[in-house]
Each structure stands twice: as C-alpha cells, then as structure tokens.
C-alpha cells in the first residue's frame, strides 16, 4: 500500500525536489511494532524522481535533531556514514504530539558530528548536510487561538542566522487554515522577514578583500583560494 501511494505521489505531480521521510513514530496504542522497508522506499524514489533529495530517514539530507530551529554551533556536512541509519533517527524523533518536544533545544552534550576530533578513526564518511525544520507557529497545524503566537520578523531573522548561518537548510512550516489559506499574519511576517534578510545581506563584506592566513599548506591551499571562485 505504501509503495503504491508513494508511486502515485512521485508520478502524478510533476517534478519533486524533496521526499521527507519523517522519523516520528507512526505506531498506534495496540502494541504492534511497525517495520519500515527503507531501502525499498529509497529505490522507489530513485526510480521515479532521481533528482529528489530523500530527507530525515533518508540518505541525502539529515535531520538537525530537534524541531525548535536549533542547531549545533558547527553543523558539519561531512559526517560518519552511521549517522544516516534510519532506525537511529527514529529513536530520536517525536513519539507523540508534544509541544515540549517541539521546543527542545540542542544541548552541549549532544554528539559532535563532523569536527576533526569526531572523525578521527572513522573510515566511512558521507556528504550528509543538515536541514532545520520548524514552524512559524507553536505547532504544525493551524489553531485560531495561536494567531497571536506567530513568530515575529525578528524571531524569523534570528532563526535564519541560527540555521542557514550555521550551515543548514531551513524548512519553515506554514500551517494552512480550514480554507486552505495561510493566515495574513503568517504571510506578512514571512514577507517582511525575507525583505529584512535581503537588506541585511545586500552588502558583501568580503568583496574586495584579500584573504590572509597565518600559515598555509602549499600553494594549492593558499588563503586566496577562498575567494577565487574556483570550486
């Protein structure tokens, strides 16, 4: 059933750029354990949408570890391959509709994933960049009583610098109301947030500067390579 539904989604709606396999527990109160055939799901996505990124419980984009929009100070993109195990993502994911979980922050004792110290002794590394998922409201769905709890322009701007600014992509949820519309407050705050970030980043502070380093490892790794545009 799941493969049939996934196939329908992947073949009937044009180009899909992202498939989000949530790690949140889908088991009910009957005590039965749900077993997921992850490799089969991945193969289905690759077959019908080969350019789509498979996120969270997938091999392409990793979850940052919380739903509060909080990331590690250094959110590395090259990490040990073991971090992509879908089962371990499930264990850390939300098990019920819990606002306390949604507000959980990154703590100092959470695993350092990609520093040189963390990678020492690791033999299997992968490119596995992080994605930050959070909502413009307290939760994922629309509730009229939360119309005055929408993230402000300043809060959204801070969220941007704490996610994108820390080397992660930002997935911002907009709960639609019962008419299928985004609330005017949510929309206005998002537009003003975008304009605020564009204004703050309009001037490239590095333009025209000549990078220097206290030490260099040969000409190939000279400081000027930072701005030479050769990737």
Give residue spans per PLM region.
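Mature catalytic domains of secreted/periplasmic carbohydrate-active enzymes
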Residues: 1-230
């Amino acid at each position: 059933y799941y493969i049939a539904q996934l196939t329908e989604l992947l073949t009937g709606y044009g180009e899909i750029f992202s498939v989000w396999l949530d790690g949140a527990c889908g088991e009910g109160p009957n005590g039965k354990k749900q077993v997921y055939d992850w490799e089969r799901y991945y193969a289905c996505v690759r077959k019908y949408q080969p350019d789509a990124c498979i996120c969270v419980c997938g091999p392409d984009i990793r979850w940052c570890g919380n739903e509060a929009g909080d990331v590690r100070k250094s959110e590395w993109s090259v990490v040990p391959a073991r971090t992509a195990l879908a089962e371990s993502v499930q264990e850390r994911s939300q098990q019920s509709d819990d606002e306390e979980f949604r507000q959980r922050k990154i703590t100092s004792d959470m695993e350092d994933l990609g520093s040189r110290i963390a990678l020492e002794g690791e033999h299997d590394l992968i490119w596995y960049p992080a994605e930050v998922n959070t909502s413009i409201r307290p939760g994922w769905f629309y509730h009229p009583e939360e119309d005055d709890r929408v993230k402000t322009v300043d809060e959204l701007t801070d969220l941007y610098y704490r996610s994108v600014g820390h080397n992660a992509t930002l997935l911002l949820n907009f709960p639609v109301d019962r008419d299928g519309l985004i609330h005017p407050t949510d929309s206005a705050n998002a537009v003003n947030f975008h304009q605020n970030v564009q204004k703050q980043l309009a001037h490239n502070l590095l333009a025209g500067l000549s990078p220097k380093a206290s030490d260099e490892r040969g000409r190939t790794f000279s400081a000027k390579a930072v701005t030479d545009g050769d990737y």
